[in-house]
Amino acid sequence: MALIVVILMISIIVVIALQMNRTSRSEVYDAANLRDRVRLFYVAKSGFSLGQVLLREDRNSFDGLNEDWATTNKIVLPTDSLFSARGELRLVIEDESGKIPLNKLVNGNDINMDVRDMLIRLLGQPEFGLDKNRAQEIVEAIKDWIDTDDIVTGGGAESSYYSSLPKLYAAKNGPLDCIDELLMIKGISQGLYNGSTGRPGLKDLVTLHGGGRININTAPKLVLRSLSQDMTVEAVEKLDKHRKTSGEDLASPTWYQKVIAGIAIDTQLITTRSDYFRVSSVGASGDMRVTVTGAVIRDHNTKKTKLLSWKAE
């Protein structure tokens, strides 16, 4: 009997020891993961600071796709010495001034017809698969989300619509604070917002920032097509090729007139200088990654940058 008790006690001790060993190894693994994640955060944050330096060091009188800050997507910096697995830093700087400024759609309760028309033309392009009426309804819903009244605009929506949904909420009745607020607006689906294979994402073509003028040197091709009802795919391809291969002649907003004929763009809608940028820096090691993203405004006279918003994930 005593032998059986001893054997049982030994078995219990072995099980406990194995469990403690497993727990200890798990804690060590978790600690290593936490250490690497902290390191990745600082790697990504350093990349974000590097992006701001590149913007401050830009001395050109205009902004284009061939500048140092615009080609950071080609930069991959190894950080292997900091991690047990391969590590790297990736940096991308996007020109927010080349996108359509959503918050300029409304001034108080009045609609900005120039921005409205650009958005309708943008959403009406074949890549989005929407007809003109549907595109207009979505723009009206964005307008209703931002304006301060509760009057429904055409096919738009106010709080009366949103309060009838399974997860009820009210219309913002104020400027958009983050781009993913668009997903709360009537008519904007995940597919429209994010895009998919062969389809663009609305989030990549619009911005919360900007004074209302769009930089034609950096605007995505779909945004270029929305600048005029006469703009064609062929004309945009010519403009895109020219701005990627030309130099100083991109300083004037009217340079496009030398490349395409018979298409007029309102000069009040375009510029060749940019003030707002989005910096995205990724620190990665193995399957782990940390991204620091933020919006930055740059003063053209002092070349100083100011952080408007940022997040780490």
Predicted regions and their residues:
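Compositionally biased linear targeting/interaction segments
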Residues: M1-E313
